[in-house]
C-alpha cells in the first residue's frame, strides 16, 4: 500500500475549475485581452502571484499587482467559503486512507485565504499532515524543486510519494522530479487526458478508483 500522498486541490479534490475559468474570462473580457483555449492549462500551476505576473507582463493586462489581487480575492473568497463542492467520492476516500494510516499532504497553487476556509468547510483540513500553497515555497508547480522541498518536509523519499493532479504541466514536472504520479480527470482538462495518461503512472476518472491503486 502507498503510504504517502501529495494532492493538488483545485480540479483534483474540489470542483473549482469552472469558477477559476469563469473569473479569468471575465477579467480578460472586461480588459479586452485575447486568450487561447489553453489558458487554464497555462495558468493553473502558477499560483496567484504567478498568474498576476503572467497576465500583466505577458498578456499586457492593464492592472497593478495590487488591483489584480483585490479583484481575485473578493471573487474567490466568496466561492471557496460558501459554494465550491468536493468532487465525487473525495471525502470518503480521504477518510478511508487516513484510517489506514496514510500520510495525506496537499500542495496547491491556491493561496491560503481561499484554500484553508474551503478545506475546513468540507471537513478535510484536519485529515492532512501538511497543507501547502505554492506561496509557502516562493515558487510554482512547474519548478521541480517544489516537489523536492515538499518531500524533504514530509520526510519521505521522492519515489515513495504518490502525487495526484489534474494539470498536465504539474504532473509532468512532478514525474521529472522523481515522484510517482497519478493523473486525475477533470472536465476542465479533459482534452489533455491522452497527454496526461502518457506521462503518469496511473490515471483515475473517479476518486474511488484511487483505492484500488493504494491497496494494490
Residue spans of the language-model regions?
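Metal-dependent phosphoesterase signature
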Residues: 54-92
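Short, acidic loop-to-helix structural element flanking the phosphoryl-transfer center
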Residues: 78-106, 112, 116
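Conserved SAM-binding loop
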Residues: 13, 86, 104, 139, ...
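Helix-loop "lid/cap" segments that line or gate small-molecule binding pockets
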Residues: 27-28, 47-61, 118, 150-151
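Asp-based, Mg2+/Mn2+-dependent phosphohydrolase catalytic module
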Residues: 1-3, 95, 111-112, 116-216
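An amphipathic alpha-helix signature
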Residues: 21, 25, 48-53, 65, ...
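Active-site neighborhood of HAD-like aspartate-dependent phosphohydrolases
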Residues: 1-41, 176
